[in-house]
Amino acid sequence: MNELILNLKGDVSVPVEMDKIIPEKIQEMSLEKISGIELIQGNKTAKVSEIFDVELKESPVSKVTINNCCKKVKRIGEKMTSGEIVVNGDAGMYVGVEMKGGKITVNGDAESWVGQNLKGGEIIINGNAENYVGSAYRGDWRGMSGGKITITGTAGSELGEYLKGGTIVIKGNTKIMPGIHPNGGMIIIEGDIEGRAGGEMMKGAIVVYGKTLEPLPSFKFEGIVEDPLVKLFKKDAGTQLKGTFIKFSGDYVNTKPKGQLYAAIENNKNLI
C-alpha cells in the first residue's frame, strides 16, 4: 500500500477539481505518473505537479494526504470506494460526492455539498460545513442513502435534503430546514437549530439536543418519552437515545407519514 502526500504549493485563485485523485485510482501508479495527472482547473487543466509538491511512501493503508489545503480545492474523494483521505486545511465544495466506501477526514472547514448523494463510508469534518450537507443533486429526489457524516462544528441550511439512509451528526448549531424532504435515515443535531426541521418528512428521524423553534404546524405532538429506542424500519435494531425528549410525528402534509422528530426537553420546555 502507498500513501500519496500532496503539499499545496501556494495560493490557488482558480478552483481545482480533485476527482481523479482517490486512493483506489492511484495505488498502482508511480510517482511520475501521478505527478502528470491532468486536473481540471477552471476552463483549463493543470498537472498535479504544477499545483502540489508530490511525495509517495509506503503505508499500511491506501491513503491520500493533502496538506495546506484551501477552499479552492474541490471534489475531494468523489466516488471513492476504499482507502482513506486526510485533508489538513479547508476543503472546497463536494467533499465525498457519491462516495461508496472508505474514510475522509477534513481538519478544517468545508464548503457546501459535503457528502452529496453519499452511499457509504464515513466523512468527518473537524470544523464547520456550509449548506446542503448530505443532500441530493439539484433536481434529484434521491439523496444520501448510506454511510455517516460527522460535522464537529456548525452546519448551514437544508442538510439532509431528500435523505434516504445513513446518519448525519452535527455537533454544533445548524441553520434553517434541516432534514427537508427526507424518506429515511437519521439526523442528530447536538446544538441549536433555526427551525423548520423535517419539512415534508415521510420517513426517518431527526433528533435535536439543543434549542429549536416550534415545529411546523403539520407535525403532531406524540408525548414525552424517556430514553427512546428510535427505529427507522421494522427490522431495525434501533438507536438508543439517552434523556427525556418531546416527540413529534409528521410531516402530515404527506399521506401516512412515518417521520419522527425528537427535541430534548431540557432545552425545549417551551414546546410542551
UniProtKB/Swiss-Prot annotation:
Which segments carry the region annotation 7 X 13 AA repeats of [GW]-X-X-[MLP]-X-X-G-X-[IL]-X-[IV]-X-G? 77-210
Pfam families for the chain: GXGXG (PF01493)
Q: Which InterPro entries match?
A: FMH_DH_FwdC, Formylmethanofuran_DH_suC, Glu_synth_asu_C, Glu_synth_asu_C_sf
EC number(s) per UniProt?
Answer: 1.2.7.12
Does the record bear Oxidoreductase in its keywords? yes
Name the Gene Ontology molecular function terms of this record: formylmethanofuran dehydrogenase activity; transition metal ion binding
What GO biological process terms are annotated to this protein in UniProt? methanogenesis, from carbon dioxide
Q: Where are the sequence repeats?
A: 77-89, 96-108, 115-127, 141-153, 160-172, 179-191, 198-210
Q: How does it assemble?
A: This enzyme is composed of seven subunits fwdA (65 kDa), fwdB (53 kDa), fwdC (31 kDa), fwdD (15 kDa), fwdE, fwdF and fwdG.
- What is the name of the protein in this document? Tungsten-containing formylmethanofuran dehydrogenase 2 subunit C
Upper lineage is: Archaea, Methanobacteriati, Methanobacteriota, Methanomada group, Methanococci
Q: Its gene?
A: fwdC
